[in-house]
């Protein structure tokens, strides 16, 4: 496997879920690639969604995602018109154009299985099988969607464990402590260390962050200016961002209310989270369910804190945030199905707090303190999406995650602030808490608000 890029914490894809939509779509597309040489022999495919993918798969559009992937399409390539046409062909006409080349019959009721029982390696798993005319299995693969749009086969998961101990990457780090030491040794900021690391891997950190930033802006614009009244699904949740935007344009907040800027943060976060919930184009940050926290804090900084924020400063914010997200991916989880919403909104808030602290001229130590504070006050947060949809409580959690990130950043900048808990310690605590959490509260829609609220 190629060396892990910190830049991949941010991925351009589609909503509503990175683990349940982007991941299954990638699994389907990769399975198509594995059929090269035997594609014409395939007469049927079977999809089995396991664990959380089965329990919340319909609300998260996992079923539709894997079907689109089996056409050889990845989430960053998908257009809305293409999506509608492919799903109509597969679900209404019962024909699947495998790898966008080979037509086979498809029966949703028989060929797509929802198995609530999780596999042992991760709560989000899917098994894909291809059969020939004799009903023999030509190819079978198990994929694990581990959060943030990252997908691995069984073999790749094994290789990940081996690489952790064997791989040597310039300017790499495995903990916040190591990151701090790197910054001090080279007299560089976190963003600069990430640049050095990614350049050593022949990646293009600044060009990539420009692309990510513009995708975030596009997502905000689409959500804030949507003409749709309701989000899709049975809950009939009203899109609130367009009306907030209209109100703020007509009646900008005055200086009388010291907390008036919260309305703008709500606008930014709701617009992006609502666009994600509608299945629109989004950026994982680090997941789709938490996609609005980082960009809404960035928009707050750009539009209200700093005049003429440069593209380099924006890139620095994103690279700093990505470094924090990388620590959670490496040492804990980005999956609500594995560790609850603390692994999604909590991580996003931690990332955004670190990024904002950097923009506010924080030291590296203060950046890490800000990230720690933000996570500390998300510990134990459950993932209980009502109806399996990424709407209630997910959208408003993005708003509050952004507000907490801003508060954490401000706290960390206090000269007399002396932390008792390190970022490494809170990351370990989050993961342990997630492992201890009852499965009902880990993206199964079997507990919490998902059970209390009847839809």
From Swiss-Prot:
Question: Does the keyword section mention Iron?
Answer: yes
- According to the UniProt entry, what is the EC number of this protein? 4.3.1.17
Can you tell me which family this protein belongs to?
Answer: Belongs to the iron-sulfur dependent L-serine dehydratase family.
Coiled-coil annotated residue ranges, if any: none
Which protein, by its recorded name, is this?
A: L-serine dehydratase
GO MF annotations, alphabetized: 4 iron, 4 sulfur cluster binding; L-serine ammonia-lyase activity; metal ion binding
Q: Which NCBIfam families match?
A: sda_mono
Output the Gene3D superfamilies linked to this UniProt entry: D-3-phosphoglycerate dehydrogenase, domain 3
Q: Which reaction does it catalyse?
A: L-serine = pyruvate + NH4(+)
UniProt keyword terms in alphabetical order: 4Fe-4S, Gluconeogenesis, Iron, Iron-sulfur, Lyase, Metal-binding
According to its UniProt record, in which pathway does this protein act? Answer: Carbohydrate biosynthesis; gluconeogenesis
Q: What binding details are noted for the cofactor?
A: Binds 1 [4Fe-4S] cluster.
- State the signal peptide span: none
What does this protein need as cofactor? Answer: [4Fe-4S] cluster
User: What Pfam families does UniProt report for this protein, alphabetically?
Assistant: SDH_alpha (PF03313), SDH_beta (PF03315)
- Top-level class of the enzyme under EC nomenclature: lyase
Quote the InterPro entries the UniProt record gives: ASB_dom_sf, Fe-S_L-Ser, Fe-S_L-Ser_mono, Ser_deHydtase-like_asu, Ser_deHydtase_bsu
